[in-house]
Amino acid sequence: MFVYCLNNPICRIDLYGNVSEEAAKEKIEENKEEIIAAGKEFNVDPAIIAACIYVEQVLNVNWMDSLSDLLCYSFDTSIGIGQVRVSTAILVEDNGYMEQSQGFYANQLYISREEVVATTLADDKANIRYVAAYLAYWQDRWSDTLDISNMPEILGTLYNLGDNANEPNTSPKSNGFGRHVGVAYGMMKMLLYKRVGNRGVQYEIN
């Protein structure tokens, strides 16, 4: 069951909490320039970045998340468009993929590194860069064993499992999340490179 969100008949929310596929697609289209730029920056296929974000939105995000993300800085919660955990962002920083966040004092109140990271992750553009950086981390970690840069199902699985993932091997298996990423991959490529012109919808797929 869906209802309009913010009196907008296009933006709908599921009363049971799930983000609609339409809303998730719109999120990708709204941020496609940032997704493509992050892919170039971290040498990750932008369509895989988009597919991970899309599947997170459809499977793991509900309307309560947007209310709770910024209230949970003291916990290792998943935040933002790509549902990046605070600990994951710190891992990415500590491995040199992103500049390290620093805690600081503000009016004698200490703002922890975790709080700084959580605030950063609430910004879509920054969050997308962390998604891309984390996927780059997994590509590099596996590079000596298997090139997974063109395997959306496996990168999606690793993105989802994190520390619970198997060690690099030559016969990786995808989980449910990874298979959803694989299914979404082609659609994300079309969304990212769709261009509307005088000749109608065209695609500029690199």
Task: List each language-model region with its residue ranges.
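Catalytic glycan-binding domains that act on GlcNAc-containing polysaccharides
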Residues: S20-E204
